[in-house]
Design a protein with these regions (language model features):
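Loop-to-helix junctions at membrane interfaces in multi-pass transport proteins
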Residues: 58-189
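Helix-loop-helix junctions that connect adjacent transmembrane helices in secondary transporters/permeases
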Residues: 1-43, 127-265
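Cytoplasmic-side transmembrane-helix entry/capping segments in multi-pass membrane proteins
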Residues: 54-60, 237-240, 267
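Flexible loop residues that form catalytic
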Residues: 34, 54, 63
């Protein structure tokens, strides 16, 4: 249940990204992102998920670096952007935020949750069981740490600097697509906007694999009636049908998003 709520945050982010880039309304974006996810996740399988995760990870790294450099250049350098932020509100660059809401306990718990707690999330734990050997596991720790640092540090820094470069942005969930379209030519914007879409798809891949497995194998196939009636060639059809129904459910949940996506993820 909670994972379905978390997945709805990915739908919201994907729909807002498509709305900003393609000029469509939010609800149309929800439908489009649902169709994309059906083809990427439902009919892909585990091997396809792992391959796409790797490709999308590379897209995220290069796009983060390109956008960070472009925002700094567009804003006239770090010093100029910093001065703009201070002119808006001197408290923006303090550890406690513009209105003092970022208390030490909130920030520390946030980073423990995001930085350490994710290791225990089921969809992450499943991927950790798929390493070929110990050598692959050790290599992934090093590579993963570098990748996470680049993406997490880069995207958060872009978000802060965007306030100094484009202070009129009100929809904070749409910051990345808005500034991308403003600071980059269309061909680079297309590449960079593939990064948040890649992040959305990789997250949904892992979460959906877990939900599908838990719902179908642990719940539905544990009942005697379904176990007896769904056999042979009926099993793949049944699995695909349940997966599509889950996606449709999440699609309807996402039609009325919260004010900020992070609230759903933290919940």
């Amino acid at each position: 249940v909670f994972l379905i709520a978390t997945m709805s945050a990915q739908w919201v982010g994907g729909a807002k990204l498509l709305a900003a880039f393609m000029g469509i309304n939010y609800k149309t974006g929800i439908v489009v992102i649902s169709i994309i996810i059906i083809f990427c996740v439902v009919f892909g399988g585990l091997k396809n998920i792992l391959i796409t995760d790797m490709i999308q990870g590379l897209i995220m790294i290069f796009s983060t670096i390109i956008l960070l450099y472009s925002v700094i250049s567009y804003g006239g350098g770090i010093e100029n952007i910093t001065n703009n932020l201070l002119s808006i509100n001197e408290k923006i660059l303090t550890p406690f935020g513009a209105n003092g809401s970022l208390t030490p306990s909130y920030v520390s718990s946030f980073w423990v949750l995001v930085g350490v707690g994710v290791i225990g999330i089921p969809q992450i734990a499943i991927n950790s069981m798929l390493y070929k050997n110990k050598r692959s596991l050790k290599q992934s720790i090093i590579i993963g740490s570098i990748v996470i640092f680049i993406v997490m540090f880069g995207v958060h820094l872009i978000g802060v600097m965007a306030r100094g470069v484009f202070p009129d942005i009100k929809d904070y969930d749409s910051v990345i697509p808005i500034i991308t379209l403003k600071v980059l030519p269309w061909y680079l914007a297309a590449l960079v906007l593939a990064a948040p879409m890649a992040a959305i798809i990789t997250t949904v891949n892992a979460q959906f694999l877990l939900i599908s497995s838990a719902l179908i194998k642990d719940v539905l196939f544990s009942t005697k009636v379904i176990k007896e009636k769904i056999v042979g060639r009926k099993i793949p059809i049944f699995v695909y049908s349940i997966n599509i129904l889950v996606i449709i459910l999440i699609m309807f949940i996402s039609m009325r998003p919260p004010s900020l996506i992070v609230n759903v993820n933290l919940f």
